[in-house]
Amino acid sequence: MPRLILASTSPWRRALLEKLTIPFECAAPDVDETPMPGEAPRQLVLRLAQAKAQSLAARFPNHLIIGSDQICVLDGEITGKPLTEEKARQQLAKASGNIVTFYTGLALYNSASGQLQTEVEPFDVHFRHLSEAEIDDYVRKEHPLHCAGSFKSEGLGIALFERLEGRDPNTLIGLPLIALCQMLRREGFNPLQQ
């Protein structure tokens, strides 16, 4: 049975995969994440998830390699990580009262057989109307500077929302576990029987 590799250094993805209680290792993929000109959000996350998984095939030739990538879209524009408090406040002000869609690309690559499975999971976050004071307090308390969309749903960010819509709440954090379990079973790797 091939071993599992998570092609990520994200502590959030690692924590999500640990929920399945199956053994795995993490490895950093070497992938240029620059969008191609005119590339749609779904195509971008699908391409990057696939590239991350396949980039580790030479190092891990008999493994199931999991690649994932996520972007945040508001009003048709990709919203990246804010990196500064001012940018985080701007992103949250723009999201206030609106719907932000997260697209998470998932790829499972069997480096022994060359079999590749991919999927894109959308997840909608409906923001409630936020006051400037609420936005300031949230940014000060959570420091969401390295989070797409400027929030952490697994923390205080939940207080920003009116409702969430999607098949798998893990998708919002960065790794759609329901889809991943389906892919693993198709490879003969049932997480319940490991």
UniProtKB/Swiss-Prot annotation:
GO terms for cellular component: cytoplasm. Its cofactor is a divalent metal cation. Its EC number is 3.6.1.-. The keyword Repeat does not apply. Keywords: Cytoplasm, Hydrolase, Nucleotide metabolism. It is an enzyme of class 3 (hydrolase). The record marks 12, 70, 154 as: Important for substrate specificity. Its main location: cytoplasm. It is found in: Cytoplasm. Nucleoside triphosphate pyrophosphatase that hydrolyzes 7-methyl-GTP (m(7)GTP). May have a dual role in cell division arrest and in preventing the incorporation of modified nucleotides into cellular nucleic acids. This is 7-methyl-GTP pyrophosphatase. It comes from Salmonella choleraesuis (strain SC-B67).
